[in-house]
């Protein structure tokens, strides 16, 4: 229906840059929604699981643009340089033996404030919950359908929040298209 059409601002040359326009409508608008939904602030330390994928890289860039400290968590070692050059303060592979120690060292034993899990498998969701500090927020965007276990006393004592997020709203796409500063986020 016509109500689903979104006006593209004149400042965006969608005829000559159709790929960039499409990226703004997904890989920029989705991280914008995540920032709002997870209530991410400048003081937060944020882990991004699946940081080397399209949404993950743009999430790192969005966090960096907003002066938020991020930890790129990725199993593919060939993504390390991209994650770091796009603004991640630290790059870690969850397959390393000292992974949990590295998170605790980086956060001075407080744990992460937010973990954004673009993979959302049983393994990554359980890992996410264990990385969070007091008042931590876990936001999952993957749709694996896997069940995962978290110690309920950990949720209680740390006052953790677990939330899901799917694709952004029409308004968030409009917001992304209308903010010229997001053009800087496009991965070259």
Please report, for each region that a protein language model flagged, where it lies by residue.
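NAD(P)H dinucleotide-binding glycine-rich loop of Rossmann-like/cofactor-binding domains
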Residues: 1-50
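Rossmann-fold NAD(P)-dependent oxidoreductase module
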Residues: 58-62
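Glycine-rich phosphate-binding loop and adjacent beta-alpha segment
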Residues: 66-68, 122-186
């Amino acid at each position: 229906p016509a109500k689903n059409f979104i006006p593209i601002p004149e400042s965006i040359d969608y005829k000559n840059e159709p790929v960039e326009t499409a990226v703004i409508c997904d890989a920029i608008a989705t991280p914008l929604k995540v920032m709002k939904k997870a209530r991410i602030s400048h003081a937060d330390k944020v882990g991004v699981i699946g940081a080397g994928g399209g949404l993950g890289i743009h999430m790192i860039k969005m966090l960096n643009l907003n002066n938020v400290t991020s930890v790129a968590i990725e199993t593919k070692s060939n993504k390390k340089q991209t994650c770091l050059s796009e603004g991640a303060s630290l790059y870690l592979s969850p397959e390393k033996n000292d992974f949990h120690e590295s998170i605790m060292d980086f956060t001075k034993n407080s744990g992460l404030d937010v973990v954004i899990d673009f993979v959302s498998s049983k393994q990554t969701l359980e890992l996410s919950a264990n990385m969070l500090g007091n008042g931590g927020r876990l936001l999952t965007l993957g749709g694996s359908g896997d069940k995962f276990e978290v110690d309920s006393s950990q949720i209680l004592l740390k006052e953790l929040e677990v939330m899901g997020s799917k694709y952004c709203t029409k308004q968030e796409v409009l917001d992304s298209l209308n903010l010229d500063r997001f053009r800087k986020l496009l991965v070259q």
